[in-house]
Amino acid sequence: MANPKEKTPMCLVNELARFNRIQPQYKLLNEKGPAHAKIFTVQLCLGNQVWESEGSSIKKAQHSTATKALAESSLPRPPPRSPKADSNSNPGSITPTVELNGLAMKRGEPAIYRPLDPKPIPNYRANYNFRGMFNQRYHYPVPKVFYVQLTVGNNEFIGEGRTRQAARHNAAMKALQALKNEPIPERPPQCSEEKKETEENSDASKSEISLVYEIALKRNLPVNFEVLKESGPPHMKSFLTRVTVGEFSAEGEGNSKKLSKKRAALSILQELKKLPVLPVVEKPKVHYKKRPKTILKTGPEYGQGMNPISRLAQIQQAKKEKEPEYMLLSERGMPRRREFIMQVKVGTEVTTGTGPNKKVAKRNAAEAMLLQLGYKASTPLQNTPEKMDNKGWNGQRAAFPETTSNTQKGILHLSPDVYQEMEASRNKGVPGAPGNFPTAKEIGQGSAGPFCTPSVGNTATIAKELLLSGTSPTAEALVLKGKAPALACGSIQPSQQLEYLAHIQGFQVQYSDRQTDKEFMTYLTLSPVQMTFHGIGSSIPASHDQAALSALKQLSEQGLDPVDGPIKVENGSCDIQAKRLAERTESKPTNSGTTAQDCKDSKAVV
């Protein structure tokens, strides 16, 4: 319905039925049509009378039936109700005080309410010469009356009521009756004239505050806005703002800070425009130095050291051609030894690459594609040996470390040149010392060493003496005591010193070598105590010396556990011996105190 207070046909039917003391009944008779456009038929029974009607919804059909029933029904109608008397003379829900506030804001005059003291009750003194009146037992209190003074501009109104709010409403009603017919006062002509002049002389797109800042910036004057005063009720505030530009100052007042600031700027603009015009000074042209080119022309070595995948993508982008397409062709091998084959396609060129993982295979495929396209290989700038995984004799994985890592404390690195200098100095210090030492075959094949129960102290002492002076009096004494042929140990290589110590103490030394691009790696094992060491050098003897030096250093600090029973050195390659030794260690767990961490700490290069 247009008016929400207007009653609907169904509501009127209910009133008619209530007046005649009958019950209206609505029945849904039929429902037809598609789901999106149904038509409902509703029947209304009001006493003995029946009406039917249709609609697009049940509610609309009910309203249509009720409308037809109201028009055709012969039942007596209820008398119309008289409208309720509105005690409030003010139409709507707006109170007189709110309406007066709106009118006062339009007029630009604040409405101020002040409470007044009530009138004093008159006191009549009785004459004491006559007989007193009958004293009433119950006295009804005199109702208290509140008074409020209302000031709107130059007009004053007095309101009274039983409460302070009623007195305010009474005063507001009197003010509304007096001010409704009065015209709204116009603003002072000075402000309008100043505003017109300012708009004519200044740019219309700029405010007065912006113009003040522009003039102050040109004349290098400071600008400061300050709110001096804030007065008036909360709904009708009045602000007084002062603006200072150098030696000039002005004030502006308004019902908001923005308006007072604007009026203050408008006032001071008149003073700033009276200043003399500044002379025009041409600014010198600023010459900017051209930045040097940081990107140099690429030489023939450009791209070396880069990731081949990124390099290949950059080449295709520079050619404005399609980027390389990578695809995994196959995956083969055991679960822990996978081998992936990746294919890269650039235009009509196709290459493949293999690797232990997809990343390495993709890199190798990109490297092969670069070589096929005629570019140089993307060799790294710094040759860093790849990490090599190898199974130790005890079944544990032992990785050859990278040369770029730091050396552990206590591990000494000696190059072949240093070894030669040390050897020369030792030869000078010990004349007549033999330059050669018997090899492993000469130490007796098929027979045990002369001593089967070496002590930890003897091993550490002999190792220290060999490291310091190149000879070991303790070892010579043990040889004489055992009635074995004396084996002198002069200033020889660390690998020969270690073999001499192994012959004296009765343990076996085994080397396993592997070659990389420019270096040799040695995996040294002392059996059956299962102590492992590593060495890296430019040649096999140098890598052997590195590993042996690390072993001597470790033995000089910790010694060697006793060896149970003689050791028989078998003929054959080092790989065969390693396999047989691995079978022995699997069947008999070692009681050596040397763990994987000890082996890791004993590496020659970390």
Swiss-Prot record:
Limits of the DRBM domain: 8-75, 95-181, 207-274, 307-375, 493-557
Protein origin, superkingdom: Eukaryota
Region (Disordered): 57-97, 177-205, 580-606
The UniProt record lists the keyword Transcription: no
Keywords, ordered alphabetically: Microtubule, Repeat, RNA-binding, Transport
Biased composition (Polar residues): 85-97, 588-597
Pfam families: dsrm, Staufen_C
Transmembrane segments: none
One term under GO cellular component: plasma membrane
InterPro entries named among the record's database cross-references: DRBM-containing_protein, dsRBD_dom, STAU2_DSRM_1, STAU2_DSRM_2, STAU2_DSRM_3, STAU2_DSRM_4, Staufen_C
Biased composition (Basic and acidic residues): 192-205
GO biological-process terms attached to the record: anterograde dendritic transport of messenger ribonucleoprotein complex; germ cell development; germ cell migration; intracellular mRNA localization; protein localization to synapse
GO terms assigned for molecular function: double-stranded RNA binding; mRNA binding
CDD domains for the chain: DSRM_STAU2_rpt1, DSRM_STAU2_rpt2, DSRM_STAU2_rpt3, DSRM_STAU2_rpt4, DSRM_STAU2_rpt5
Role: RNA-binding protein required for the microtubule-dependent transport of RNAs within polarized cell types.
Recorded domain comment: The DRBM 3 domain appears to be the major RNA-binding determinant.
Entry protein name: Double-stranded RNA-binding protein Staufen homolog 2
Organism: Danio rerio
